[in-house]
Amino acid sequence: MGSFDDPFRVGAELITEAKKETDHILIDFHAEVTSEKMAAGWYFDGRASAVVGTHTHVQTNDARILEKGTAFQTDVGMTGFYNGILGMSKESILENFTTQMPTRFTTPDTGEGQLNAVLIETDDKTGRAKNIQTIRIDGDTFFMD
């Protein structure tokens, strides 16, 4: 595996470039560790309209506007199969854990889906976040904070 650059430094450079075109900047911070995602939120606070984490497939309940106007949520969640694990069939994931052998994760052909998202409203002039709402649809059940 090759070396990777510092996402905080690179993100700051990309924001500088993007600001030449728009003040509305969304950062999808793809990481495993919640503390790294939170650090990104605070680091980019006031420079990005929103910082939302992805990767864990589990929607967090911490949507908020940070001190300098950046919308933040540790993890948006996922879109996938509802009655499974990480959007996959529970049987394939359980087989992986119980046999400790590599297993191909599968998705069912039918079944209820799940959609996780956030709705972010920004100020037209400044690009700062005015509101962030969590959206979750599980089968026929709709939740919105």
Question: What is each residue range found by the language model?
Answer:
Residues 1-2, 33-35:
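Short, small-residue-enriched loops and turns at beta-alpha junctions
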Residues 20-29, 47-51:
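Short beta-strand/loop segments at the ligand-binding rim of alpha/beta enzyme cores
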Residues 2-10, 39, 92, 112-115, ...:
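Conserved active-site and cofactor/substrate-binding residues in soluble primary-metabolism enzymes
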Residues 34-105:
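Conserved beta-sheet core of the metallophosphoesterase superfamily
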Residues 94-145:
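A short C-terminal boundary segment appended to hydrolase-like catalytic domains
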Residues 1-24:
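Binuclear metal-dependent hydrolase catalytic cores centered on His/Asp/Glu-rich metal-binding motifs
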Residues 29-31, 136:
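Short, structured patches in soluble enzyme cores that scaffold and shape functional sites
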Residues 26, 55, 120:
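Divalent metal-coordination and catalytic microenvironments
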